[in-house]
Amino acid sequence: PAILDHYLQVDGNAGILGWILGHIDQFAELAGSKDNYRAVLFGGILGSLYAILQFVFAPIWGSLSDRIGRRNVLLITVSGTTLSYVLWIFSGSFGLFILARLIGGAFAGNLSVATAAVADVTSRENRAKGMGIVGVAFGLGFLFGPALGSVASFFDLSLNRPNLAALGINPFSAAAVLSVGFSVINLVWIWARFKETLPQQPRDPD
């Protein structure tokens, strides 16, 4: 809701946001919904859009990793994720915020590559354990990620650094900066420590 309120103040009812909210209002009239329908439906649309892009791009990244290797695709996708967070830092308009989410969703489809890498390095007997560890990692991310993001959102860089407003700094830029930091750490670790798990010989040329 806070993100929606912010971009309503910035963009008003014009542009992409106005078009979306206009259709949401029409839907609300038909459904007879009560207060806060805008925020609830808006959040659902953003979350669904991100998940749909993950779903679409997961097989694409997985197929590409079969040809050029897991490490290369992970470097590409984590770089793309970092880019999406950088755009979020400077999302002074709703359109740029949506673009950041679209890019993030597309590159977040690398889950298939990560699980494939685990499958590459585990035996048949230990594969379930390896996949379980992946699940634990995701669970920890879902547990601590929102908590850290909510804490970071209390630091409004647009108020603390008003001279950066022209660059698109917004009330949620601090959370985006934190996300960039974790993403860069991930990227550096992959580049420095992650060894290719898919041997050259069995790779699919097609």
Q: Regions from the language model: what does each represent?
A:
Residues 100-138:
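Cytoplasmic helix-loop-helix junction between adjacent transmembrane helices
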Residues 55-94:
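Conserved MFS/SLC helix-loop-helix module at the cytosolic interface between two early adjacent transmembrane helices
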Residues 131-154:
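Glycine-rich segments within core transmembrane alpha-helices of 12-TM secondary carriers
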Residues 78-85, 104, 182-186:
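MFS 12-TM fold signature
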